[in-house]
């Protein structure tokens, strides 16, 4: 599998405070990299740096090319970002919101040529089960439907890499499973990869292929998901018996 995204000694500082320090990893085709760790570990800040949202030191390369060398429109064709919070204040239809994912592929703002945009939007609506809701106002959607709408938007964008910050945050269990299953289906196509911040360790373990375990802005462990998410490593970072706590919770339901 070929390398798609590479981080080398990435550091992010807010004033005198270092939030991410000397973090390196490589993302290859077909991989789903989970960024896990306690609150304040620097996970969301790291993906903001990858998406171009915050300045950083170090090097980020996309298919061997420095990310800083890409124009914003070029980068948007290659990387799709799903933020943790997606607020809406206008009564756009589901289809209109999903169609915004094609903006990066328009030749210019006024004469927006996008030859396969309609087909991409249709596929995204179908994949996320939103075809029947295409004309509904996004202001009328449930939390799960709204999150699927924004996921469909990045699917319509047709990027090579998805960057996701808590993609199932605040959703019921059934919607969490649905969102992660949709992403898993998207990932099966050639030339794709995913990086996501996930707090739910069970979801990270089930769907991830690889992980970076972060602690206080640094990498505590990285590699294949089963090698990283061990009882010993998780306990060292979370400062508690994570597996024991999970077993106790499940035992209460038995």
Question: Where in the sequence are the language-model features?
Answer:
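The feature captures the beta-strand-to-loop junction immediately N-terminal to the Walker
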Residues: 36-38
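Helix-to-loop junction immediately C-terminal to a conserved catalytic motif
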Residues: 51
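Conserved ABC transporter NBD signature motif
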Residues: 58-66, 75
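Conserved ABC ATPase "signature" region
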Residues: 99, 114-133, 139
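Conserved ABC ATPase signature
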Residues: 137-141, 145
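Catalytic Walker B motif of ABC-type/P-loop ATPase nucleotide-binding domains
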Residues: 162-166
